[in-house]
Amino acid sequence: MSKPLIEVKDLKVYFKQKSPKLLSFKPGILKAVDQVSFSIEKGKTFGLVGESGSGKSTIGKAILRYHKPTGGEIFYEGTEIGAMGEKELLPYRKKMQSVFQDPYSSLDPSHTVQDIICEPMEIH
């Protein structure tokens, strides 16, 4: 078996909340992504699906290193890129792209999977 093109191990992306949580005197921490792992094989299509606010875009931005990971490892073609500096990342960023969801084609959590699949057939 060959090395994955992209491998993510126990990725964490936490953000400090600017204002304290209600009834708390300490600033909070928002766990946008917490211990996510997956791999993408070369030549394969990978879709990351989830509800709004579940961390999909944050994962993409962490892989491209637009958000600095709080923890975990990110590998591209076997090279660990999670801790690289900006200049070291440039050649990798030229090879990667994140395609963000179209809000008009996203899944609505208030509908069942059957409703979502059948809707286009009912319209046409």
PLM regions: where:
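ABC transporter nucleotide-binding domains
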Residues: M1-H124
